[in-house]
């Protein structure tokens, strides 16, 4: 088996059961897939089922098949954090020994005061809140005062919300860059996020697609860096470029929804290249998981599942595809935060063995180790390749 292209598709927030340390995060009982299935009386995912999804963990409507089109397993998060950045970095070989800082009581004066001074405005909020709730609470005051809304969550994020007619997206992005410069050292949050919105009342406020993330960059090279350094290509889809600070990426298509992300993946698969295609499908997390909408979550899964045959038809000899996730965000549990869960591992390709139980991998960095072995790169500090099990 001579693999030339690896495609990694991250179903953002699609966890597959509580991790062993879920109690440390308040996430006992979380299971994004199975709990969603139970809430809607069964998932309809025949193509992922054929890959082995139902063999990883029981979930209503998704059985373990008699005939497989892929191999399957699950990966346990090792990094001390359950956020998007930690999950994606770990997949690419960076395990964080300490979590990014969080601010359940809001940001201290050492952060807020210089931020206010540099943007020349006050701020509203400065607390932990749901993104939709805080717009209902403070959106009208923001329109009246012109002050941006600053808030956080259980994740390591500094989020700035602003109405597009009050503070333009360009101005909002500049504020985020200022915040990113301030948030270093002990206050080095994982992400600064621009959250533009529209509407003229609490009932009509709606976040727009012009969200933008400003993530820290890894201190050591990731597999992305190593693939590019070896003279190969890295194509990114969705917010991958933001998550890695545009580092180790040859070409990016910053899509903002699942349908556009899938189209971008299909287009990149038409390109004759050797290297890595890394895509994030955001809607499970951003639109449905955080808003506790299991019906929408299930429908989004079904929409991706229905188009998997199109992706499979694009594959050629030398292709290997991985479908996984970065963390959970169980839409059926109280609260709107991420959940500490295992993530699914589905692997397939024209020359890849099917029906192999890859078991429980001890870190998401097993994916990085596998990519490193495929391309003859230096192995990451963490992770064990599963390539030999697929040959």
From Swiss-Prot:
Pathway: Carbohydrate degradation; 2-deoxy-D-ribose 1-phosphate degradation; D-glyceraldehyde 3-phosphate and acetaldehyde from 2-deoxy-alpha-D-ribose 1-phosphate: step 1/2. Its EC number is 5.4.2.7. InterPro entries: Alkaline_phosphatase_core_sf, DeoB, Metalloenzyme, Phosphopentomutase_DeoB_cap_sf. Keywords: Cytoplasm, Isomerase, Manganese, Metal-binding. It catalyses: 2-deoxy-alpha-D-ribose 1-phosphate = 2-deoxy-D-ribose 5-phosphate; alpha-D-ribose 1-phosphate = D-ribose 5-phosphate. GO terms for cellular component: cytosol. Belongs to the phosphopentomutase family. Mn(2+) 2 binds at residues 285, 290, 338. It is an enzyme of class 5 (isomerase). Isomerase that catalyzes the conversion of deoxy-ribose 1-phosphate (dRib-1-P) and ribose 1-phosphate (Rib-1-P) to deoxy-ribose 5-phosphate (dRib-5-P) and ribose 5-phosphate (Rib-5-P), respectively. One of its GO terms (biological process) is 5-phosphoribose 1-diphosphate biosynthetic process. Pfam families: Metalloenzyme. GO terms for molecular function: magnesium ion binding; manganese ion binding; phosphopentomutase activity. Binds 2 manganese ions. The gene is deoB. Gene3D superfamilies: Alkaline Phosphatase, subunit A, Phosphopentomutase. Mn(2+) 1 binds at residues 12, 326-327. Its cofactor is Mn(2+). PANTHER family: PHOSPHOPENTOMUTASE (PTHR21110:SF0). It comes from Herpetosiphon aurantiacus (strain ATCC 23779 / DSM 785 / 114-95). The keyword Metal-binding applies. Disulfide bonds: none annotated. This is Phosphopentomutase. It is found in: Cytoplasm.
């Amino acid at each position: 088996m001579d693999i030339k292209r690896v495609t990694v598709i991250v179903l953002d927030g699609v966890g597959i059961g509580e991790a062993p340390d879920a109690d440390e995060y308040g996430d006992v009982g979380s299971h994004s897939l199975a709990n969603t299935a139970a809430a809607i009386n069964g998932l309809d995912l025949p193509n992922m089922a054929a890959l082995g999804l139902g063999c990883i963990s029981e979930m209503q409507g998704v059985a373990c098949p008699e005939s497989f089109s892929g191999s399957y397993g699950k990966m346990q998060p090792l990094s001390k954090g359950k956020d998007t950045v930690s999950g994606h970095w770990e997949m690419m070989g960076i395990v964080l020994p300490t979590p990014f800082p969080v601010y359940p009581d809001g940001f201290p004066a050492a952060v807020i005061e210089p931020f206010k001074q540099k943007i020349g405005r006050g701020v509203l909020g400065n607390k932990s809140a749901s993104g939709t709730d805080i717009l209902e609470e403070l959106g009208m005051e923001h329109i009246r005062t012109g002050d941006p809304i600053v808030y956080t969550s259980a994740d390591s994020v500094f989020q700035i919300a602003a109405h597009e007619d009050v503070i333009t997206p360009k101005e909002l992005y500049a504020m985020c860059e200022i915040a990113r410069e301030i948030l270093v050292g002990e206050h080095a949050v994982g992400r600064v996020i621009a959250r533009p919105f529209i509407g003229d009342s609490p009932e009509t406020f709606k976040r727009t697609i012009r969200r933008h993330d400003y993530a820290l960059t890894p201190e050591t090279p990731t597999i992305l860096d190593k693939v590019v350094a070896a003279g190969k290509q890295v194509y990114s889809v969705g917010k991958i470029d933001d998550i890695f600070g545009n580092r180790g990426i040859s070409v990016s298509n910053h899509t903002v929804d699942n349908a556009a992300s899938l189209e971008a993946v299909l287009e990149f698969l038409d390109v004759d290249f050797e290297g890595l295609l890394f895509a994030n499908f955001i809607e499970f997390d951003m639109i449905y998981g955080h808003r506790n909408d299991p019906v929408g979550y299930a429908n989004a899964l079904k929409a991706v599942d229905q188009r998997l045959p199109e992706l499979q038809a694009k594959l050629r000899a030398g292709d290997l595809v991985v479908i996984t996730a970065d963390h959970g965000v169980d839409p059926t549990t109280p609260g709107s935060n991420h959940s500490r869960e295992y993530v699914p591992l589905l692997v397939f390709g024209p020359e890849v063995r099917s029906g192999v139980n890859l078991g429980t991998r001890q870190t998401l960095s097993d994916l990085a180790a596998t990519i490193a072995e495929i391309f003859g790169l230096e192995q990451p500090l963490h992770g064990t390749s599963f390539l030999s099990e697929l040959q």
